[in-house]
């Protein structure tokens, strides 16, 4: 599958590619790379890597108070610029109640905010946080049971809940995308927009800058709520929401959707009819992807190149339908992680999950996905970037490195030779906002699924350029199942409650091969490359 993708991407460019020198037949562990750097393949959004807060966090709004934690905000700020999507299954079971009083935890937080600058205000009290953290495991069990049994109850959220979400996004440098309840229906199954109107009125009165979605995975509405909505009706609902936005202070707000699940059978049919009825009013098409069922996924699945390759076909299906019906429409991964159902216990929150995450980012950029929203930044389940104690997990550090080193311009790279599936390489122009690097530099990111170290040789014009290595490996006795990660041999952890550590490079001697140990991943920045496509 990966070979077919490379043929599709590389096409006639192979003849133009800069290859390794003739006569350098590689041994098993020395690999020659090819780069095509004449022009960018495409550009992705500066917010390409984005994050989500699952709507389930608002089921009991007390737990939204977590978002007042300065530590959590500092971690989110590290991933800016990014979108923050508030959505998920519970989107369609949350109802805004403007008359609902804040919880005691929310009141405690807001009363402490004596500073008019909310982003420089007092943190949530330690006592409140401790109380919530003690109660969170029980709430998490309730949420996961609800998800497994597919028996969802409506909940209400208040103005205070909206304020907490918005202040978290604003103070973290994130752009909030808010998912509206699509299961509020009239007797003839049209969308009932009255509750959305109440929320729009409130957000308008506060001057909030928010983008919007409507519903979550409409292909599974029947399973979740025994309501069947086809693509035509859903498209008409989006047109109605667009009209609502046009009549409000949100006339310039963005609208995204339909947030369908995996592109199979009836879901693809729903997408087609949705795009025909409502495709013109959305700014980007959103869909969701997970590789595996979290309840049965194995470590071997997480390290399988065949599993990674399944993503390619899903992307191709989505792009094909989009191009046919709404050519030129941008496509986003509106929600994605390793395994659905909250992730795979003892896997989705470990170093092993990084292979799926980094490969998905690389393939998405290559194939034309403009934004990838990681489920979830913080919340229930096992696929979060930050755990219940506000400790960053391996995928957080991987995401942070990606943000700092990888720019939006996408280039082509590939491994020379027949077997490319277990050594997966991706190439971008370097992020020019990194103080150490400049226009024209290259960032190569690689994952090695072989059980031996691989030594990579870049094409000859770049072979003598200085290279900085950022190698990620698990830390501690748990190996690939570790929740701790080291960068170039140093364990990554926060310096204090609001300070991220320096991500220190390891410079290589000029002309060195780029070594990547077995079952590891990392980034190589080729400095002073002076690549025209990156200038």
Curated annotation (Swiss-Prot):
Residues 280-409 are annotated as: Required for heterodimerization with the heparanase 8 kDa subunit. Its main location: membrane. Its EC number is 3.2.1.166. One of its GO terms (biological process) is wound healing. Belongs to the glycosyl hydrolase 79 family. It catalyses: endohydrolysis of (1->4)-beta-D-glycosidic bonds of heparan sulfate chains in heparan sulfate proteoglycan. Disulfide bonds join 119-171, 429-534. Expressed in skin, mainly in the stratum granulosum and the first layer of the stratum corneum in the upper part of the epidermis. Also detected in hair follicles and in sebaceous glands. Optimum pH is 5. It is an enzyme of class 3 (hydrolase). Heparan sulfate group binds at residues 54-56, 89, 150-154, 262-272, 288, 295, 340-342, 381-383. SUPFAM superfamilies: (Trans)glycosidases. This is Heparanase. Residues 1-27 form the signal peptide. Coiled coil: none annotated. One of its GO terms (molecular function) is cargo receptor ligand activity. It is found in: Lysosome membrane; Secreted; Nucleus. The gene is Hpse. PANTHER family: HEPARANASE. It is a peripheral membrane protein. InterPro entries: Glyco_hydro_79, Glycoside_hydrolase_SF. It comes from Mus musculus (Mouse). Proteolytically processed. The cleavage of the 65 kDa form leads to the generation of a linker peptide, and the 8 kDa and 50 kDa products. The active form, the 8/50 kDa heterodimer, is resistant to degradation. Complete removal of the linker peptide appears to be a prerequisite to the complete activation of the enzyme. N-glycosylated. Glycosylation of the 50 kDa subunit appears to be essential for its solubility. Residues 519-535 are annotated as: Required for transferring proheparanase to the Golgi apparatus, secretion and subsequent enzyme activity and for enhancement of PKB/AKT1 phosphorylation.
